[in-house]
Amino acid sequence: MESYDRLLAHNVKPSMQRIAIMTYLMEHRTHPSVDDVYTALSPSMPTLSKTTVYNTLRLLSEQGAAQMLTIDERNVNFDADTSLHAHFLCRKCQHIYDMDAPLSATKQENKLAAEGHQVEEMHYYYKGICKNCLKENIRID
């Protein structure tokens, strides 16, 4: 799905800046922060402000077009993949990896639904040291 269509599908009025931000999120699966998106797009969009990037990413998250990740206490990151999945944050290199959701996630969601609840969000975060940093024997002190 193109970014323009995705915005419409989530009741977000498309603008040049919103399309650019959605496109960036969809093309860069790196879980970027507001600063990452702003730094990448501002050279080609001189009128883009960091506030616009923040407000747009927040709107995309609120409308279900993106996920807001609060796995890192210092940054908020965003993910265009809104399917049920987990995230792993490497405490050394700060890379965020996508992972399969725990097998119990769907089971728990079904149980809550059977009890009359409506689940709107589930977040599964893991933190540790990634295999690349372990390979390089990098330690957190």
Question: What spans do the regions from the language model cover?
Answer:
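Short amphipathic alpha-helical elements of helix-turn-helix/winged-helix folds
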Residues: 6, 23-28, 40
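Basic amphipathic alpha-helical segments that dock to polyanions
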Residues: 53-63
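Pre-recognition alpha-helix immediately N-terminal to the DNA-recognition helix
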Residues: 19-24, 36
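Non-DNA-binding regulatory cores of transcription-related proteins
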Residues: 62-141
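Short capping segments at the starts of secondary-structure elements
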Residues: 14-16, 28-33
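Short, Lys/Arg-enriched N-terminal segment that forms or immediately precedes the first helix
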Residues: 1-11
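DNA-recognition alpha helix
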Residues: 36-45
